[in-house]
């Protein structure tokens, strides 16, 4: 079911992309017509025909987007991406910047976690050195705060005299 919906979404997206490309090409063509407009009856009729074709294509695109059977209603585009496009920027740049920002954030968080783990281990070592009777409690705390560890406490802390 999910795979079928995903396939339908992919089909709808490809169809929408093709329709948008046709509309954009037609508007570019219309812009050339307007720029080179000779003022003849035939050229005016060609421009009107091209404009009518664009209106029809946009109407079809709108109908497809509002079709209850279409998977496009489940496809949400972030407003930031739309703003990028509206500003004349490439949405791929947004994607690249977003991925880089997430990567930097992940590196920062990873460094914080690593630093806190080192602090925890250092504190545990000092507590065990000074108060050996608390070693079971310290090991318990380390075991609960280190889900990736299989041993409750690092050997360097336990092996201290």
From Swiss-Prot:
GO cellular component entries: mediator complex
GO biological process: regulation of transcription by RNA polymerase II
Primary location recorded for the protein, binned into one broad class: nucleus
UniProt subcellular location: Nucleus
InterPro entries reported for this sequence: Mediator_Med10
Protein keywords: Activator, Nucleus, Transcription, Transcription regulation
A Pfam entry, by short name: Med10
Molecular function terms from GO: transcription coregulator activity
Keyword Zinc attached: no
Functional description taken from the UniProt entry: Component of the Mediator complex, a coactivator involved in the regulated transcription of nearly all RNA polymerase II-dependent genes. Mediator functions as a bridge to convey information from gene-specific regulatory proteins to the basal RNA polymerase II transcription machinery. Mediator is recruited to promoters by direct interactions with regulatory proteins and serves as a scaffold for the assembly of a functional preinitiation complex with RNA polymerase II and the general transcription factors.
Record's subunit section: Component of the Mediator complex.
Family: Belongs to the Mediator complex subunit 10 family.
Listed name of the protein: Mediator of RNA polymerase II transcription subunit 10
Annotated organism of origin: Kluyveromyces lactis (strain ATCC 8585 / CBS 2359 / DSM 70799 / NBRC 1267 / NRRL Y-1140 / WM37)
């Amino acid at each position: 079911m999910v795979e079928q919906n995903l396939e339908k979404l992919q089909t709808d997206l490809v169809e929408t992309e093709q329709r948008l490309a046709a509309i954009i090409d037609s508007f570019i063509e219309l812009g050339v017509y307007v720029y080179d407009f000779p003022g003849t009856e035939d050229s005016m009729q060609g421009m009107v025909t091209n404009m009518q074709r664009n209106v029809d294509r946009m109407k079809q695109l709108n109908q497809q987007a509002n079709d209850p059977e279409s998977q496009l209603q489940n496809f949400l585009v972030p407003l930031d991406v739309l703003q990028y496009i509206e500003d004349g920027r490439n949405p791929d740049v947004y994607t690249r910047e977003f991925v880089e920002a997430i990567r930097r954030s992940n590196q920062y968080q990873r460094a914080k976690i690593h630093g806190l783990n080192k602090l925890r281990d250092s504190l545990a070592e000092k507590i065990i050195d000074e108060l050996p009777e608390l070693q079971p409690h310290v090991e318990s705390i380390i075991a609960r705060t280190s889900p990736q560890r299989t041993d409750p406490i690092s050997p360097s802390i336990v092996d201290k005299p």
